[in-house]
């Protein structure tokens, strides 16, 4: 397994994306920030859905993107598993067929691994929020990706379902051996799903650390706005 390294710059309208980030194998990093901070654009750049104006995206010694060298692998050439906020399952396919779309050989085993093997013949419309998430994650991992990217995976759920699914997803991500990035605007999601949190604002990462570190010593006004002021040792 290799470390993911991102150092990109890009202009999107009035937003200037300029950041560096590294994610180790088996580590989950949350990109936490307000809407419009550029979080999802970072995922798109990693996946090859957005070509930055400058910078690099490397996975170990493998160069997925390097503006100076003229390297820009297509999305199909990058080993990335993607899970979007609406889970994007094919509605006309069964659960098994959805996962087989990524890998026919791996589908039965990975459905069983994620606890939804008995739903193989079910249609997506009949699934609960947690079941849909498990199937989407199974499909993303069926192709044995080297990087896993999740874009607001819990935002479409109601409060009660969100709490239950968050706990399930945290357990699943703890077993994923590849670099993983989760985009979220919710500090609770970030705390439960990620090892480290990178707070973004205005296209830049303004502070990185565990949630307790960020809460204990916020270094940017956006960190304070999201997490509150530094906690006092006094009682």
Task: Indicate where each model-derived feature is located.
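Conserved H-loop
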Residues: 177-183
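ABC ATPase NBD coupling module
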Residues: 64-81, 214-218
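A short, proline-enriched helix->beta-strand linker immediately N-terminal to the Walker B motif
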Residues: 142-146
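Catalytic Walker B motif of ABC-type/P-loop ATPase nucleotide-binding domains
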Residues: 148-152
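Conserved ABC ATPase "signature" region
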Residues: 62-67, 105-121, 125, 170-171
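Hydrophobic anchor residue at the start of the ABC signature
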Residues: 137
